[in-house]
From Swiss-Prot:
Residue positions of the active site: S167, D224
Originating species: Malassezia restricta (Seborrheic dermatitis infection agent)
Disulfide bond entries: C54-C293
GO CC annotation, single: extracellular region
Entry protein name: Secreted mono- and diacylglycerol lipase LIP4
Catalytic activity: a monoacylglycerol + H2O = glycerol + a fatty acid + H(+); a diacylglycerol + H2O = a monoacylglycerol + a fatty acid + H(+)
Length: 300
């Protein structure tokens, strides 16, 4: 846990070097509703989101209804990524969250808002800005991930493509979803982001809503502080699609429509520990401690 404490200590430094921009998007006041998606699907996505944390075991491993097909990286120089074929979600790519690697941690604190790299710019509308470190982490894996996805789509005769991830991996998952939605003929099927930090500006949030809204969901567990960074006052904004598990690691979950819903996770002060960031999501352990290796689905 020492590297996680170190990461937490770096957040004030990141805040000091970013120019305040003001709140850059709406605050929804819509009432919460029941989930618009079967929680069993969310449980499956959570299991696949955890699997990149598992170093040992790999190709052929089963995670719920999915089989690991391909993996790359050890979480040191680049984030680990794994691709599955899931009966319920199709060809699924999952990105690892922050590791003890200095390079991984630096992705989290490189918090400047930048224009999308030229390779992915066609996926976005004018005015979109991305969290630099998260964008860089995705770009390091982008081309090879795309090649593998296309290969496995053909191999399994399955057009469905899903992205998932936890923490830093969640940010990479939404960036991948936007990119793949543009590059793939049939777009993406679903995208799930567990414990996702804010990944772009208001234009980014609007673009996500416009292009993959209804297929993208981000999940907050209790008073997890990670989805609250970086602050909205610095120009960062979550898209729509929040599912809030509260109390944490329980079966009490609701969907909070619109961006930055007033009644959702923003309504409670975050706790400055990782107890809620790593937790039980839809009966599946995810993150350091609650998650096990190999990953499992629906066993927590």
């Amino acid at each position: 846990m020492r590297f996680l404490a170190f990461l937490l200590c770096l957040v004030p430094l990141a805040l000091c070097i970013i120019e305040p921009r003001g709140i850059d998007g709406p605050t929804s006041h819509e009432a919460p509703t029941d989930l618009p998606i079967d929680w069993h699907i969310l449980s499956q996505a959570a299991g696949m989101a955890h699997e990149p944390y598992c170093l040992f075991g790999d190709i052929g491993d089963r995670v719920g209804d999915a089989e690991v097909l391909w993996s790359k990286g050890h979480g040191v120089v680049i984030q680990r990524v794994k691709i599955f074929h899931s009966k319920s979600l199709g060809v699924t790519v999952s990105f690892e969250g922050t590791t003890a690697s200095l390079l991984s941690i630096l992705h989290d604190v490189n918090a400047a808002l930048i224009d999308p790299p030229k390779e992915v710019a066609p996926a976005y509308c004018e005015g979109v800005k991305l969290f630099a470190g998260f964008s860089n982490a995705y770009m390091e894996l982008r081309d090879e991930v795309y090649e593998q996805i296309v290969k496995f789509q053909k191999q399994f005769n399955d057009k469905r493509v899903t992205t998932t991830g936890h923490s830093l991996g969640a940010a990479m998952a939404v960036l991948a979803a936007m990119d793949l939605n543009k590059r793939l003929d049939d777009g993406i099927y679903r995208s799930f982001a567990f414990g996702m930090p804010r990944t772009g500006n208001g234009a980014f949030a609007n673009d996500v809503d416009k292009k993959i809204g209804g297929r993208f969901f981000y999940i907050v567990n209790g008073r997890d502080w990670v989805p609250r960074v970086l602050p909205r006052e610095l120009g960062f904004q979550h898209p729509s699609g929040q599912i809030w598990i509260n109390p944490p690691s329980t079966t009490h979950w609701k969907y909070y429509p619109g961006q930055e819903n007033h009644y959702g996770a923003n309504s409670e002060d975050p706790i400055l520990t990782f107890d809620d960031h790593h937790g039980i999501y839809f009966h599946t352990g995810l993150g350091h401690g609650p998650g096990k290796c190999p990953a499992s689905v629906g066993t927590a």
